[in-house]
């Protein structure tokens, strides 16, 4: 029958208070940990709408007429903290729309809007009727450019959405600035001319890398944090298997270190292949090729291997009961570094340029879109993490092995001492029996 101890049982004497304090303190520590981490995470997005002006938009007036003027005046209506900042430059600096597109692709600007050459003249001729009215296309007035692969959610809401709002206002401003003159020259008997007057200005759109699949919202969130959790789960299983088979303490540290290094390389290679595979499997109509698959695979590989090394070192030095206080913050600060662009977050968060997740995601954007040269920054930072992680993992493996070896030696000494004690006891018993036999009378 199983003995069930009541709270008032003597078993609890001297244990009630420490037991209760232990549970209470653990609960408080975990609550404070999550409070701190979620405050950090929420801080990334706190009042981000009021930082939209940090998103710079290149504006170039190739028209030089009333439509270019209408664009400038319309922007003044929206100019403020909650609207991206248009930075106007002359055609001399950006001689063609191709140069504007290259500037957006390089990452110099989050987007661009330009007036098409001769747009005002084409509209003026269309209002007079004739063949010009029949061939007039209001979408040839303005063009806006963006890179849909660079933080897709931000591109959809803050860039494309705001630019389309601005473009809608340009038409109203045009009528306010030039409506009377346009009406005086309007050929009211020509249907196409009237349509040109009613809808004078629209915009064409150039998306450098359309990224419209539903899974795009996971690229800089779930697909950044899950590789960290994945390495942690595997390491817990890997360390458990090593302990079960008594590997530590019985092999020299060099062999164990090489075994763990080989395992980390092979496992992260396969894990990164699987991750890239499911991204490709759900890409829908996303226009990417095999070369980009391979480069993204390699990007995930180095990112996962860095996390493997960091967590391997952590599991070596930090007791299992306290690992939560390292793994959770490590995961949160890394995903917070990619969930939103730094332009929309408080300046404090820019320290996360140094984190592997941010450089990995920057590298992934370059691979996916072919834009934004970040290799000069991303590769040195990722390589530094790889070197530091490898050094920590080697140190941790050596520490783990020495600690296990010391435990084996201590256990051996205890067993040896117990064996000697048993032998001495047996020897004493034998001597006592012999003495008793000698003293007993012969029958």
Residue ranges with predicted function:
Residues 1-214, 410-443:
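Extracytoplasmic/periplasmic domains immediately adjacent to an N-terminal transmembrane anchor
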Residues 42, 213-236, 245-428, 443:
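Membrane-spanning alpha-helical segments of multipass transporters and channels
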Residues 141, 204, 239-251:
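Hydrophobic transmembrane alpha-helix segments characteristic of membrane transport
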Residues 47-49, 82, 95, 241, ...:
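Residue-level detector of solvent-exposed, low-hydrophobicity positions
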């Amino acid at each position: 029958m199983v003995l069930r101890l009541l709270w008032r049982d003597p078993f609890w004497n001297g244990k009630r208070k420490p037991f209760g304090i232990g549970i209470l303190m653990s609960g408080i520590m975990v609550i404070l940990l999550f409070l701190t981490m979620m405050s950090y995470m929420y801080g990334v997005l706190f009042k981000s709408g009021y930082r939209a002006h940090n998103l710079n938009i290149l504006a170039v007036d190739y028209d030089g007429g009333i439509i270019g003027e209408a664009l400038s005046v319309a922007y003044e209506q929206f100019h403020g903290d909650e609207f991206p900042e248009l930075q106007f430059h002359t055609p001399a600096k950006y001689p063609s729309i191709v140069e504007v597109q290259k500037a957006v692709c390089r990452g110099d600007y989050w987007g661009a809007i330009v007036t098409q050459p001769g747009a005002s003249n084409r509209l003026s001729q269309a209002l007079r009727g004739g063949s010009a009215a029949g061939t007039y296309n209001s979408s040839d007035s303005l063009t806006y450019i963006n890179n849909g692969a660079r933080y897709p959610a931000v591109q959809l809401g803050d860039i494309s959405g705001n630019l389309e709002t601005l473009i809608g206002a340009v038409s109203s401003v045009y009528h306010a600035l030039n409506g009377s003159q346009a009406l005086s020259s309007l050929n009211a008997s020509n249907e196409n001319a009237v349509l040109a007057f009613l809808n004078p200005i629209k915009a064409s759109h150039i998306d450098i890398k359309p990224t419209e699949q539903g899974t795009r919202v996971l690229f800089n969130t779930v697909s950044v944090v899950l590789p960290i959790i994945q390495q942690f789960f595997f390491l817990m299983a890997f360390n458990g298997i090593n302990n079960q088979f008594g590997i530590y303490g019985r092999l020299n540290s060099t062999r164990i270190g090489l075994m763990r290094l080989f395992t980390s390389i092979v496992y992260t290679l396969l894990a990164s292949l699987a991750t890239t595979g499911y991204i490709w499997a759900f890409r829908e109509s996303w226009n990417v090729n095999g070369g980009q698959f391979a480069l993204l695979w390699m990007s995930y590989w180095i990112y996962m291997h860095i996390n493997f090394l960091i967590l391997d070192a952590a599991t070596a030095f930090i007791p299992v009961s306290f690992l939560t206080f390292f793994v959770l913050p490590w995961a949160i600060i890394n995903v917070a570094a990619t969930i939103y662009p730094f332009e929309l977050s408080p300046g404090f968060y820019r320290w996360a340029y140094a984190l592997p997740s941010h450089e990995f995601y920057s590298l992934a954007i370059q691979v996916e879109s072919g834009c934004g040269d970040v290799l000069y920054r991303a590769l040195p930072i990722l390589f530094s993490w790889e070197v530091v992680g490898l050094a920590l993992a080697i140190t941790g493996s050596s520490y783990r092995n020495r600690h296990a070896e010391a435990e084996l030696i201590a256990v051996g000494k205890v067993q040896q001492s117990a064996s000697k004690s048993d032998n001495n006891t047996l020897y004493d018993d034998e001597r006592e029996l012999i003495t008793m036999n000698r003293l007993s009378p012969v029958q």
